């Protein structure tokens, strides 16, 4: 399972520089290490630089081992097996959340990785639902636009330059790619980002 993408013209670096985002392929019987070759600014689950609010739901799984929650904070955690998963009956159509922004931010894109990503159990990507169409809306301005999201675990971006800068962004699920086993829709990673990502083909 190869996961990669290229971010162009990163802030604070040479304008011609290219940043790589990638997951190393998992070897049989071993978990992939070095999940990302480089972390984009956005933090991890422990020290997030992005915050989320007004999330409509999240999945809580109960088993003999205990309880596991697929919380919205997982969206800024790049480690494998840490998606946000909606928690309502059905495919999560209409579920939503808000990504908070910073007063000094100049983000023009949403950087995301679709689905449930697991190097040790890659079939979870197909078995769970993935977002297909989303509504992106400025919380203050009310400006909104629909986008089709690619059905790929590779990093991709959504251009939100139509929104005023420093505006909180509301995401609503409008349609999904249905999973083959679980009636749950997952997003592995989603933050606001300054640069476009060139998807791996």
Question: How should these model regions be labeled?
Answer:
Residues 69-140, 157, 164-201:
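Aromatic, loop-rich ligand-recognition surfaces of beta-strand-rich domains
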Residues 3-100, 196-201:
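Disordered, acidic Ser/Thr/Pro-rich linker "stalks" and the adjacent N-terminal cap
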Residues 21-22, 58, 134, 139-142:
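Compositionally biased, intrinsically disordered low-complexity segments
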Residues 25-34, 107, 143, 179-180:
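Short, surface-exposed beta-strand/loop "edge" segments at domain boundaries and coil↔beta transitions
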Residues 10, 30-33, 76, 134-137, ...:
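Residue-level detector of intrinsically disordered/flexible regions characterized by low predicted structural confidence
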Residues 141-162:
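Extracellular carbohydrate recognition and processing domains
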């Amino acid at each position: 399972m190869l996961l990669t993408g290229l971010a162009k013209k990163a802030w604070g670096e040479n304008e011609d520089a290219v940043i790589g985002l990638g997951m190393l392929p998992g070897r049989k019987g071993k978990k992939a290490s070095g999940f990302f070759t480089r972390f984009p600014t956005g933090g991890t689950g422990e020290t997030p630089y992005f915050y989320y609010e007004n999330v409509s739901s999240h999945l809580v799984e109960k088993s003999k081992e205990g309880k596991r929650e697929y919380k919205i904070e997982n969206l800024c955690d790049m480690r494998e097996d840490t998606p946000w998963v909606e928690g309502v009956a059905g495919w999560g159509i209409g579920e939503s959340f808000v990504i908070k922004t910073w007063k000094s931010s100049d983000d023009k894109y949403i950087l995301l990785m679709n689905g449930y990503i697991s190097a040790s159990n890659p079939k979870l990507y197909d078995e769970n639902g993935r977002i297909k169409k989303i509504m992106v809306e400025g919380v203050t301005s009310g400006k909104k636009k629909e986008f089709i999201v690619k059905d790929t675990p590779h990093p991709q971006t959504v251009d939100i330059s139509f929104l005023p800068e420093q505006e909180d962004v509301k995401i609503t699920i409008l349609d999904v790619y249905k999973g083959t086993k679980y009636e749950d829709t997952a997003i592995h990673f989603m933050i606001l980002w300054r640069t476009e990502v060139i998807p791996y083909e």
